């Protein structure tokens, strides 16, 4: 069963991102939105954790949040808009929002 995991909190304020990365299944995907996109800050531990999963991680970023924080989507991830977020929510069997 595939799950879309959605994180919106800063990776610098708690351990949600690292916890999520530990439990991701092979059919799962991760969408970072809101302050979670700060995981892309250069040289940061969250970015290194994401980069270590490049080969197995299906990763999405909400484009609007990247733009608002002046960050760019890396080549190994996909930047999406809100309509694509809705499509992802339907494509996966479950959606798990890490509140």
Identify what each model region corresponds to:
Residues 12-27:
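Histidine-anchored nucleotide/phosphate-binding helix
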Residues 27-37:
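A short beta-strand-loop structural module common to alpha/beta enzyme folds
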Residues 69-99:
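C-terminal structural segments of small proteins and small subunits
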Residues 43-48, 78-81:
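Charged helix-capping and loop-helix junction motifs
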Residues 7-10, 34, 64, 99:
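Structural motif
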Residues 3-16, 36-40:
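Short, glycine-rich nucleotide/cofactor-binding loops
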Residues 46-70:
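A glycine-rich helix N-cap at a beta->alpha junction
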């Amino acid at each position: 069963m595939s799950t879309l995991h959605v994180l919106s909190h800063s990776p610098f304020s708690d351990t949600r991102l690292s916890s999520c990365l530990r439990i991701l299944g092979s059919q799962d995907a991760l969408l970072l939105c809101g302050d979670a996109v700060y995981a892309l800050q250069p040289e940061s531990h969250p970015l290194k954790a994401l980069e270590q999963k490049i080969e197995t991680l299906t990763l999405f970023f909400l484009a609007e949040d990247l733009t608002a924080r002046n960050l760019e989507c890396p080549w190994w991830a996909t930047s999406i808009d809100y309509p694509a977020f809705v499509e992802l929510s339907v494509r996966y069997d479950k959606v798990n929002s890490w509140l």
